[in-house]
Amino acid sequence: MNLRNLITVFSILILSACGGGSSDASAAISPTPAPTPAPTPAPTPAPTPAPSGVYEMDENCPSHIKEAFLDVSQAPGPGDQYNMMPRLQVSCSNGNLKVNSNSVPHYSFIPMTPNDLVERDEEWVVPLEPSIDSSREPTNIGANGPVILGYMGFTNTGLFIFGPTEGGQPANQAYGDPVYNNILDDCGGHTAFAYHNHAFNTRCFNPNGLTANPATDPQPEVLHISLILGFGPDGFPIFNEYEYANNDGVNLVSPQSSFELIDGQNPQRYAFDAYEYVEKDNLEIYLDECNGHSHENPHGYEYHYHCLLYTSPSPRD
C-alpha cells in the first residue's frame, strides 16, 4: 500500500471519529433523567386447594364391616367441574352400624336426568346383627301400594339405594323400570334430590373400582363371590350376583329371581304390572319375594339379599 492510500484511510478515520458534527460546544448538556423504577408485581395468590375425599372407619366395627366399605378417599370423585368429593364415615356402637355420607359418587358423574348433582348429608343406622321376622313374611312390600319408591338401603360407598321403579314422570315411563328405560349411568345410578342407585354394577362397588370410570376401566379379572355391595334398611347385607351354594367353597351359583315376566308385558310403565312372583322349590338358587334367602355365608349373616344379572327383558336402546 503506497503513502497516498495510507493518508486517505487515516483521513477517513479522523472524520469518523469527529462525527462530522458542527454543534456548539458551549451549549449546556441536560442531565440524563433517572429511570422510573418498575412497579412491584402483586404476589400471585395461592391456588385454592381442590377438595379431597373423606373416609373414616371405626376400629370397633367387626372385620366384615371393615372389608365391606370402600375407601372413597382414594377415588377421583365426580369430576373437576364439581366442587365436591365423596365423604363416608362408618361407626359401630350399641349393636348398630351407623353410616354418614354426603351422597356424592366416587366416580365420574354422567347426567342422566335434569337434576343437578348436589351434596346431601345423610345418616343411616341399622342393626349389626339383624334378625328375621318371626312370621317370615315381607314387612315392607306394598307399604305404598305396588309402587316401591325411595330409600331401600345404602351402598358400600355411601349412596342411596332406591326401589325398582321410577316416579310418575314422564308419563310414557310412569313407575317404569329405570334399567329397562335406559336412564341410569354405567354404575346403575342417577340424580333426583340426591344421587342414588337403582341397580348395581359390581365393577363400580369392589375394591378395584375406585377409579373415574370403573364400569369400563381395566380391572383385574376377579370373580367376586358373596361381595357385600350394600345393606338393606333392616341391616341385612346385599350380596353381588355370585356365591357358593351353602358356603361350601366349591359349587359356584348365580342366584335367580322368582319374579317372572308376564307374557306380552314389558316394564316401560308400571313395572310392577309386568311381573308376577312364582315361588320355586330350589331355595339355594331362587330367591324369595324380597330377593333374598337364607344359608351360611362368609360374613356370618343367615339371611341376605342379592343383586342379580339383568337378563330379561332387554333394556331399551
Regions found by a protein language model. Give the residues of each.
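C-terminal motif of bacterial Sec signal peptides marking the signal peptidase cleavage site
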Residues: 16-17
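Ser/Thr-rich, Proline-interspersed low-complexity disordered segments
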Residues: 30-50
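Short helix-loop boundary/capping segments
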Residues: 200-272
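Solvent-exposed N-terminal domain segments of exported/luminal and surface proteins
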Residues: 49-175
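Bacterial N-terminal signal peptides that target proteins for export
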Residues: 1-7
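Extracellular-facing segments of soluble proteins and assemblies that are Gly/Ser/Thr-biased and enriched
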Residues: 139-232
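C-terminal structured interaction module
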Residues: 277-309
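Conserved small/polar residues in nucleotide/adenosyl-binding loops
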Residues: 310-317
